[in-house]
């Protein structure tokens, strides 16, 4: 249990005690100190508890474990271990180009002012579909919209390997087109092999444990 969860439990306990005290001794609110106590216990602390809970949930929901907790996501998690460099998620995950504990969120958030919250709002929709909707087959799951190069360039822009890659200079203006989002990084016959869960039955897989020996 981390510090945020402990603080949340402490807040809830304090709110409960103060609320019971206010209900048991309503005459306390007749005095100025009692009114302050009631305001803190019934208004300030609940808001702080809600904020702490929301912060804790937001942090947990960015974890790879959370994203893959739905059964329909199992094949997407499996695709991170495909032993093929052309699989973009696998290459990034296996080489620590993205933090493994937050791999899904790192690539699927929007790198804008409120991008994290938009990503979480989409996550709420996923949860609703998981429990109340019709769950699609893994191979039928698609992005809501075309993947924006902004998300790729958040990490790759300015990197020497990106700037000097021969494949990025097949045309003289490729980097400029990618920067302006006119040429998609993950389509246009470039990095177009992403999760490809429909092909996993024919794939070979990398084992971190085997390579650690």
What are these regions (language model features)?
Residues 1-213:
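Short sequence/structural segments immediately N-terminal
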């Amino acid at each position: 249990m981390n510090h945020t969860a402990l603080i949340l439990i402490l807040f809830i306990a304090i709110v409960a005690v103060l609320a019971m005290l206010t209900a048991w001794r309503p005459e306390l609110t007749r005095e100025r100190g009692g009114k302050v106590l009631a305001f803190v216990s019934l208004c300030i602390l609940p808001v702080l508890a809600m904020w702490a809970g929301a912060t804790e949930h937001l942090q947990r929901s960015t974890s790879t474990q959370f994203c893959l907790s739905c059964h329909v996501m199992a094949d997407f998690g499996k695709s991170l271990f495909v032993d093929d460099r052309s699989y973009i998620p696998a290459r990034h995950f296996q080489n620590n180009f993205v933090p493994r504990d937050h791999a899904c969120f790192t690539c699927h958030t929007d790198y804008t002012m409120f991008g994290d919250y938009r990503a979480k709002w989409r996550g709420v929709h996923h949860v609703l579909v998981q429990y109340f909707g019709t769950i699609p087959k893994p191979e039928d799951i698609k992005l809501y919209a075309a993947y924006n190069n902004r998300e790729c360039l958040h990490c790759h822009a300015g990197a020497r390997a990106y700037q000097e890659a021969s494949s990025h200079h097949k045309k003289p203006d490729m980097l400029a087109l990618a920067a302006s989002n006119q040429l998609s990084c993950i389509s246009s016959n470039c990095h177009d092999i992403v999760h490809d869960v429909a092909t996993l039955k024919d794939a070979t897989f990398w084992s971190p444990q085997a390579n650690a020996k």
